[in-house]
From Swiss-Prot:
PANTHER family: TRANSCRIPTIONAL REGULATOR YQJI (PTHR43252:SF7)
InterPro entries xref list: ArsR-like_HTH, Tscrpt_reg_PadR_N, WH-like_DNA-bd_sf, WH_DNA-bd_sf
Gene3D superfamilies per the UniProt record, alphabetical: Winged helix-like DNA-binding domain superfamily/Winged helix DNA-binding domain
Organism encoding this protein: Bacillus subtilis (strain 168)
MF terms in GO: DNA binding
UniProt name for this protein: Putative DNA-binding protein YwzG
Alphabetically ordered keywords of this record: DNA-binding
Source species, domain of life: Bacteria
Length: 112
């Protein structure tokens, strides 16, 4: 199981990345993250929904309700233009951070 703080710190980039592909509802986001991570990432809905609400308040995503033939209506989330800009920035930051961590960990492993 992944460290909860690592997951929490990655929520924004994960959500924006998935919503950049297509609108999704909350449970769909949880399942998609789990599926793509080989079920290593088990984000709880109680973690996801506060993040979705915060992203919506910040203007990075928007939401809309869609009627379902069967079952209750679903609230879908989609990325906004501002969210796409934030995603581009965060993706660059992640690449730099990830490469830096790889260098440090590799160096430490060779010299430890």
């Amino acid at each position: 199981m992944l460290n909860r703080e690592l997951v929490k710190g990655s929520t924004v980039i994960l959500v924006l990345t998935l919503l950049n592909e297509r609108p999704m509802y909350g449970y769909e986001l949880v399942k998609e993250m789990g599926s793509r991570s080989g079920n290593e990432l088990q984000m709880k809905e109680g973690t996801l929904y506060p993040s979705l609400h915060k992203l919506e308040r910040q203007g990075y995503i928007s939401s809309y309700w869609e009627k379902q033939e069967k079952g209750p209506d679903r609230k879908y989330y989609r990325i906004t233009d501002e969210g796409k800009e934030v995603l581009a920035e965060r993706t660059k930051e992640w690449s730099v951070f990830s490469a830096m961590m790889d260098r440090i960990l590799k160096w430490s492993g060779q010299n430890g």
